[in-house]
């Protein structure tokens, strides 16, 4: 099966299908590489943050130690402590009088977690869409190619196996291309989705720890 024959045939639809497959494959692998690097750095940074938070009694000191660490847990700890300080600084305000510290911290920590996780959601929709649509786009290219191959064979009057196998074989490559693009996209989506879930679990655990420590915080 020679892809060169597909492009030499001049069929714009079949050529468009293969070009689209190529673009989808490039997008998939770019997203996979970028997301894997980002998740790796996040896990490595989170491990350092956990270690500092566990080994340091004072929350203020722990947050200062992790301030230079570029990690989701570091950002969450900094924003949670800043929210606590803002509340203590404005305890005389109407908001502080109407909203207990416990509820205020829950709201602020949840908002921080949502903002942090948005940074790790990019590309997932694209991977899911590519994994779901690539096989059907490839199948469309195959159906289109077979249809036009049969028309050309009928017009030429050549009904030999060699005349049928060549054009139809080239059209079937579109289905294989669709699977070649879709399978890595689906596997990458599942792998990255699991990585994101682990990150969410780490954030949940850290949020609970920060909430408890801030409620018992004596210093500001």
Curated annotation (Swiss-Prot):
Coiled coil residues, start to end: none
One Pfam assignment: MotA_ExbB
Subcellular location(s) per record: Cell inner membrane
Mode of membrane association: Multi-pass membrane protein
InterPro entries membership: ExbB/TolQ_transport, MotA_ExbB_proton_chnl
Cysteine pairs bridged by disulfides in the record: none
Entry's Gene Ontology BP terms: protein import
Sorted UniProt keywords: Cell inner membrane, Cell membrane, Membrane, Protein transport, Transmembrane, Transmembrane helix, Transport
Family: Belongs to the ExbB/TolQ family.
Xref: PANTHER family: BIOPOLYMER TRANSPORT PROTEIN EXBB, PROTEIN TOLQ
Subunit structure: The accessory proteins ExbB and ExbD seem to form a complex with TonB.
Function: Involved in the TonB-dependent energy-dependent transport of various receptor-bound substrates. Protects ExbD from proteolytic degradation and functionally stabilizes TonB.
Protein name listed in UniProt: Biopolymer transport protein ExbB
Gene that encodes the chain: exbB
């Amino acid at each position: 099966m020679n892809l060169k024959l597909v492009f030499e045939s001049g069929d714009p639809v079949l050529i468009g299908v293969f070009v689209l497959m190529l673009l989808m494959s490039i997008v998939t692998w770019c997203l996979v590489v970028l997301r894997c690097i980002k998740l790796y750095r996040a896990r490595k940074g989170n491990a350092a943050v956990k270690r500092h938070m566990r080994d340091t009694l004072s929350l203020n000191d722990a947050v200062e130690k992790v301030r230079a660490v570029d990690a989701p847990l570091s950002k969450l700890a900094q924003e949670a402590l800043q929210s606590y300080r803002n509340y203590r600084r404005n305890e005389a305000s109407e908001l502080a009088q109407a909203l207990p510290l416990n509820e205020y911290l829950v709201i602020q920590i949840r908002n921080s977690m949502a903002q942090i996780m948005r940074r790790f959601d990019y590309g997932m929709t694209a991977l899911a869409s590519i994994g779901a649509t690539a096989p059907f786009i490839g199948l469309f290219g195959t159906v289109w190619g077979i249809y036009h191959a049969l028309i050309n064979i009928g017009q030429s009057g050549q009904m030999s196996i060699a005349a049928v196998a060549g054009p139809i074989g080239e059209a079937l490559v579109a289905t294989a291309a669709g699977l070649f693009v879709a399978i890595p996209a689906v596997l990458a989506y599942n792998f990255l989705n699991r990585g994101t879930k682990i990150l969410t679990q780490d954030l949940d655990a850290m949020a609970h720890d920060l909430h408890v420590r801030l409620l018992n915080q004596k210093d500001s």
